[in-house]
Curated annotation (Swiss-Prot):
The keyword Transferase applies. It is found in: Cytoplasm. Keywords: Cytoplasm, Schiff base, Thiamine biosynthesis, Transferase. Belongs to the ThiG family. Homotetramer. Forms heterodimers with either ThiH or ThiS. The gene is thiG. Catalyzes the rearrangement of 1-deoxy-D-xylulose 5-phosphate (DXP) to produce the thiazole phosphate moiety of thiamine. Sulfur is provided by the thiocarboxylate moiety of the carrier protein ThiS. In vitro, sulfur can be provided by H(2)S. InterPro entries: Aldolase_TIM (IPR013785), Thiazole_synthase_ThiG (IPR033983), ThiG (IPR008867). Its EC number is 2.8.1.10. GO terms for biological process: thiamine diphosphate biosynthetic process. The active site is at K98. It is an enzyme of class 2 (transferase). This is Thiazole synthase. 1-deoxy-D-xylulose 5-phosphate binds at G159, A185, G186, N207, T208.
């Protein structure tokens, strides 16, 4: 499909973004990411040995030609996130950043106040900011207004695999957004990814559902196809939902 997605200064053919955690080893991770067709993969800066060019996490992604999206996972407030972002830019040579601030280690819920504060400052510093946030239409609009290149509202809590629990709010976010909407977190099955795309999301980010699968490489293929299918359905107009039956082949004229 010739259906390109532009975020910031990059254009993507694939609308499936990926994570790098929880894979059994670097080789499986690389093969799965390649099979997924993903062109953007996120990783926590805390997992990268920035002074080691042969880093076991970094090298497979670079060798596969996939764009890096460092994230600030582990940051508990705006100050820590800004510091991590500056380190990532210096070490990895990219101004792209997935902004994550979740002070509660149990539920990993993003802190909306600290996220907005950090986003505003990071945009001023020249970062291309993609903030992970609650599926809050007001917050997403504020993040857009301070200059974020996209918003990344959650479908469900990180790693929960519950799917698109926040559907009603995602629909509002998608409707009013003037920047790309990437549904992030909670996507546990290819059908969840397809649904997000059918709703009009511009992309999805998937990690656990691929990495923790019995066969991550095959699951990556399943997600690739699901995202393509959901996007194609959205682009071509899903049939309207009705509250009563509508015959597909009415016999009225025939019987008359």
């Amino acid at each position: 499909m010739n259906d390109l997605l532009t975020i910031g200064d990059k254009t993507f053919r694939s609308r499936l973004f990926t994570g790098t955690g929880k894979f059994p080893n670097a080789s499986v991770m690389q093969k799965a990411l390649i099979e997924s067709g993903s062109e953007l993969s996120t990783m926590a800066l805390k997992r990268v040995e920035v002074n080691n060019p042969e880093d076991n996490i970094l090298k497979p992604i670079v060798d596969a030609g996939i764009n890096l999206l460092p994230n600030t996972s582990g940051a508990k407030n705006a100050r820590e996130a800004i510091f991590a972002a500056q380190l990532a830019r210096e070490a990895l040579g990219t101004n792209w950043l997935k902004l994550e601030i979740h002070p509660d280690p149990k539920y990993l819920m993003p802190d909306p106040i600290e996220t907005l504060t950090a986003a505003e400052e990071l945009v001023k510093q020249g970062f291309i900011v993609l903030p992970y946030c609650h599926a809050d239409p007001v917050l997403c609009k504020r993040l857009e207004e301070v200059g974020c290149a996209a918003v990344m509202p959650l479908g469900a809590p990180i790693g929960s695999n519950k799917g698109i629990v926040s559907r009603d709010f995602l629909e509002i976010i998608i409707d009013q957004a003037r920047v790309p909407v990437v549904v992030d977190a909670g996507i546990g099955a290819p059908s969840h990814a397809a649904l997000a795309m059918e709703l009009g999301a511009d992309a999805v980010l998937v990690n656990t559902a691929i990495a923790a699968a019995r066969n991550p490489i095959a699951m990556a293929t399943a997600f690739k196809l699901a995202v393509q299918s959901g996007r194609l359905a959205y682009e071509n107009g899903l049939a309207a939902v009705n509250t009563q039956a509508v015959a597909s082949s009415p016999l009225t004229a025939f019987l008359d």
